[in-house]
A protein has these predicted regions:
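Conserved ATP-binding subdomain of kinase catalytic cores across diverse folds
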Residues: 40-170
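Regulatory N- and C-terminal appendages and interdomain linkers associated
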Residues: 1-48, 56-65
């Protein structure tokens, strides 16, 4: 669920704290305490639209590890991804639907994100664009990416660490 703007929400792996991880876990229904965390790189490189890290958790009743996901640090990647509201959509998927999907998905362990609107155009803009000639639509499509800018919204998602999925599914 979106949080009030004055709520602390980590925006990068460096901002992740044991207090936030504990609050996120308890907010998702876990009964636990979190005394300390250690953040390790996970994934990265080609095909990533955000920052993903493994979190080693010390505490009573807490999972030993989790995966934390944040928005991309690269402005253009973040701007494009935010224009489709992808970060908030991913969080909403885990909050609302992941348990109902008939394939194995990581368990939702908690999340926070700023309220706000995503960058999708309204119905009037869509009608105007649909009425344009094909060549103009192509030009808009090719050149719009240059003008997308990231917002200051913060997104933090905590999900189950499924380990080496390649070993399981590879």
């Amino acid at each position: 669920m979106p949080k009030p703007k004055d709520t602390f929400i980590p925006n990068t792996p460096d901002e992740l704290t044991a207090a936030w991880v504990g609050e996120a876990l308890r907010g998702a229904g876990e009964t636990c305490t979190v005394d300390d965390i250690r953040v390790e790189p996970l994934g990265g490189g080609v095909g990533m639209t955000g920052q993903t890290v493994r979190v080693r958790i010390e505490g009573d009743g807490a999972p030993a590890t989790a995966v934390a996901k944040f928005a991309a640090s690269q402005a253009q990647t973040r701007g494009i991804t935010e224009s489709y509201d992808s970060y908030a959509r991913e969080i909403r998927f885990y909050e609302r639907y992941a348990e109902r999907v008939p394939v194995r998905t990581p368990k939702y362990l908690g999340a926070d994100y700023d309220p706000g609107t995503h960058g999708q155009p309204g119905p009037v803009v869509v009608r105007i664009i649909e009425s344009l000639p094909v060549g103009v639509k192509r030009w808009i499509s090719r050149n719009t990416v240059k003008y997308l800018r990231p917002t200051k919204r913060r997104y933090a998602l905590l999900i189950e660490d499924m380990g080496d999925a390649g070993a399981v599914y590879g």
